[in-house]
Amino acid sequence: MTITLGQLAQHLGAELHGDADVIIQRIANLETAQAGEIGFLSDSKYQQYLATTQASAVLLRAADLAMCQTNALVVKDPYIAFARVAQLLDSTPAPAVNIHPSAVIADDVQLGQGVAVGANAVIETGVVLGDGAIIGAGCFVGKNSKLGARSKLWANVTIYHNVRIGDDCLVQSGTVIGADGFGYANERGEWIKIPQLGGVVIGNRVEIGSNTCIDRGAIDDTRIADNVIIDNLCQIAHNVEIGYGTAIAGAATFAGSTKIGKYCIIGGASVFNGHIEICDQVTVTGMAMVMRSITEPGLYSSGIPAQTNKEWRKTAARTLHIDDMYKRLSNIEKLLDKQEQK
C-alpha cells in the first residue's frame, strides 16, 4: 500500500511540516530508513538520527521538530502514531483466502459472509463462524464452538468443543484453547480424573500469541475479557478469569480459579498461585511469584535481579546464614538491653 504524507497527516490528525505529496510505502527505524519510508522518534536517545536519517518523513513531538532535516508529522505521542501507521501499511497476508477444497467442514456449520478456511482445516458439527472469520491451514475447531466476526486463527490452532471466541480476535499458531484443565482427586495415592465440563469464553478484540494454552473450566467457564493481550507460551488453567484490558507477557502461568482484575500488566515468566484474586491496575514484574491475593493497585516484584556470577554466588551463600545471623542479632540486642537497664 502507498499513501501520501498529506493523507497520513489527515488520518492521524497530525501537523504536517513539508511536502504533502511525498509518497510513503513503509515504516522503518530512523537509523535504517530510506526514501519512501517514514520513521518515528519516541525516545530522546535516538535524537541524533534526526539529522542523518534518509526517511522521507518522521513522526515526532513538537519539541523535536527543529532538529528534523526532512518532512515531519508532529503528533502528541509518536509511538501511538507509529502503531496507527503500521496498521495502515500492514502487508501481513491473511491466514487463508476462500475455502480450500481439502478443508473438512461439517454439513451444519454456520458460515458467515466472507469466511475463509485454509487447507486441511477441520470444522466440526455445530460450529458457528462469524462474518469475515478466517481459519488458517491445519486448524481444528471442535463441536459447538463459535468464532466471532473478523476473528483469525493462524495455522495449526486447536479450538476444542464448546469454546466461544468473540469478534476481532487473533490467535497465533500452535495455541490450544479448551483442553482439559488439570483436575484430579486423590484417593489413597490413586489419581481420579475429574472431567472438565465447563468451556472457555473469550471476549472481543483479544489477541493470543503462539503456543499458549487456555484450559476449559471444571464446571464453570474459563473467561478472558475484552481487549486482553496474551503473549506466547502462557498457561491459563481452568476457571481462571482475566479482566478487561490486561496485558500478559510470555511464559506467565496462572493456576486454577485465579482472578486477575482490569488493566493489569503481568511480566514475563510470572507465576500465580491458584484461588487468589488480583485487583485492578496491578503491575507484576517479570519472574515474580504471586502466592497471595493483591488488594491494592501498584507495582509488585519478587525474585533476585541478575548479578555477575561471583556476586550472585556470594549473595546465595549468605542467604543460607540469614537464620543464624538473625539469632545472633537478637542475642546482641538482648545483651544491649540488659546493659542499658543497669
UniProtKB/Swiss-Prot annotation:
The active site is at H238 (proton acceptor). InterPro entries: Hexapep (IPR001451), LpxD (IPR007691), Trimer_LpxA-like_sf (IPR011004), UDP_GlcNAc_AcTrfase_non-rep (IPR020573). Pathway: Bacterial outer membrane biogenesis; LPS lipid A biosynthesis. It catalyses: a UDP-3-O-[(3R)-3-hydroxyacyl]-alpha-D-glucosamine + a (3R)-hydroxyacyl-[ACP] = a UDP-2-N,3-O-bis[(3R)-3-hydroxyacyl]-alpha-D-glucosamine + holo-[ACP] + H(+). GO terms for molecular function: N-acyltransferase activity. GO terms for cellular component: membrane. The keyword Isomerase does not apply. This is UDP-3-O-acylglucosamine N-acyltransferase. It comes from Tolumonas auensis (strain DSM 9187 / NBRC 110442 / TA 4).
